[in-house]
UniProtKB/Swiss-Prot annotation:
It is an enzyme of class 1 (oxidoreductase). The lineage of its organism: Eukaryota, Metazoa, Chordata, Craniata, Vertebrata. Belongs to the aldo/keto reductase family. It catalyses: a primary alcohol + NADP(+) = an aldehyde + NADPH + H(+); L-gulonate + NADP(+) = aldehydo-D-glucuronate + NADPH + H(+); L-gulono-1,4-lactone + NADP(+) = D-glucurono-3,6-lactone + NADPH + H(+); allyl alcohol + NADP(+) = acrolein + NADPH + H(+). One of its GO terms (molecular function) is allyl-alcohol dehydrogenase activity. The modification N6-acetyllysine is found at K127. This is Aldo-keto reductase family 1 member A1. Signal peptide: none annotated. Its EC number is 1.1.1.2, 1.1.1.372, 1.1.1.54, 1.1.1.19. GO terms for cellular component: apical plasma membrane; cytosol; synapse. The modification N6-succinyllysine is found at K127. It comes from the Eukaryota. The modification Phosphoserine is found at S4, S38, S211. Monomer.
Amino acid sequence: MAASCILLHTGQKMPLIGLGTWKSDPGQVKAAIKYALSVGYRHIDCAAIYGNETEIGEALKENVGPGKLVPREELFVTSKLWNTKHHPEDVEPALRKTLADLQLEYLDLYLMHWPYAFERGDSPFPKNADGTIRYDSTHYKETWRALEALVAKGLVRALGLSNFNSRQIDDVLSVASVRPAVLQVECHPYLAQNELIAHCQARNLEVTAYSPLGSSDRAWRDPEEPVLLKEPVVLALAEKHGRSPAQILLRWQVQRKVSCIPKSVTPSRILENIQVFDFTFSPEEMKQLDALNKNLRFIVPMLTVDGKRVPRDAGHPLYPFNDPY
């Protein structure tokens, strides 16, 4: 089953369901990509920081291109610029490393992963003696100008943002000659992001949801927090429609025209996650899922300081999650 697409302002078509690769083991991700392509996925979401772009590149080389499973022009590949590479001099070398690792000549979409910059260098998480992060003063508007040059060179087809708030999006738009096409943020029924989605849609940005199933497999999960996949409303709709809870959560997003990048390395789940285009929710069913919103954010980078878990970057002036949206 092929995923339906949304049209970006660049004219590109982005499939509404893509394969996420965050937390996918290098040893497992190659087979996962190959399987996903074989069952109709045409959108792969990557990032330099995930540490597995080389293996993804091997899968793409074997399966994408003339005479192979998928022609390159049918595939939509996203990657992301890491925080240590925001300095304008570091942007193109970072992209070229990603392209070399993925064995691609261009990316369909390149995102700035976070609004703030870490200290330049090869350590992905440069730290002070007390364990806190060492930041760099480069502003995302300077980074954006360097990203725009990549489009002019034909290395990237579209640019976007990840983990930016509404104010920061407008700040980028105020200087952009290449406007961002996509915002990628955490989004699921517990964190519906309605205001942020409306803000983006009014400005011609499409939204991609990461952790659309609630990311209950992450290492720092609080055992007390609610589990989206076990939410009674979700289970009831799954039973009613003869679907899995994951399919219910993904259908809710694609019906709102929000693209999703569920991560899996399990063939049965990879297949299940794209089988969400042959059923529809009524307006009442959509409202039931909308009503689950509690502005509950799961993905907040944390640090342990003096034995306590604290948000790693919350004190940074460009931290995105201190604003209402």
